[in-house]
Amino acid sequence: MLESSLRLRGKNASYRIIQEVEKRVEPVTEKDVTIVLPVLNEEDGVVAVIDDIRRNGYQNILVVDGYSVDNTVAAAQAKGVVVLTQHGGGKTGAIITAIESVSTPYLLVMDGDYTYDAADIQKFLAHARNYDEIVGSRKSENISRLHRLGNGFICAFFNALIGTNFSDVCTGMYLLRRSAARHLVLQSRGFSVEAEILAQMSMLGRATEVPINYRTRIGKAKLVTWVHGFEIVKSIIALGRLYNPIFLFSFTAALAAIPGAAMLLWVLWMWLNGFGFRTGWAITGEILVIVASQAFFVGTLALLLKRSELRIEKVVKEGIGSG
């Protein structure tokens, strides 16, 4: 009886300690975050985005312009927000400029075309203390079928190479911890910068995602589906070479199974139809299939090791954080 009572008291004491710790950890508020709008010729949407942000209670707004040739800058300045001209090319230059310029502990990036809902910002702030990056996973209602298909392929490819489980790596709305973001080394130039940031944050920090709304954009779309999709895939391959090279090269070598199997099927068809047995082609096909099988095994092992490494890193970081 005494033992049970002591055990119960111990549990209550632990619970009170947890409550006290939670009280001391101040939540992230609107004063702790700067909303960053990278823009290029967004005169049709930037004013609506700024109004939407302010309507939801956020006043720290930074517009980073990529040398617009329309009235984007004038429209943003007329709303009384800070407007900077980016250095460096593409969207990457805008993100780097923002990271160097903001003074708040967090920055939240969202496109200036009104596709993202400022009401969702609170979802990011609710988890900001525990993560270096939080990405917004878009609902698919206003995303075209072709874009959904491409995004699904890109996400699957990204997750396989990096060892993660994200549902939207191409999203244009995400929160960054400024102290962690300043350690990013960004090399991409276009829309693939989001995938590059997420890869580095996943490997070197902590990242998660929250569900967000996605609206029809205001103004003309700049995204050319196939061109930018290819750029993103190319960028992810480059990231794979850096963060998980064994899996990437093994996966590439495993593709040798396709011509190898084709050769063996052709040899079998020729033999069954009385055209003789093609020994040279059969040996070549067998070699390709064997090499591909071994590469697939090595790639699978590399992927398992990478995921184990990520789990260990996560446990270590959580231990350091709690200590």
Stretches with model-predicted labels:
Residues 34-38, 62:
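Short hydrophobic beta-strand elements that form part
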Residues 41-55:
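Short, well-formed alpha-helical segments that are part of the catalytic scaffolds
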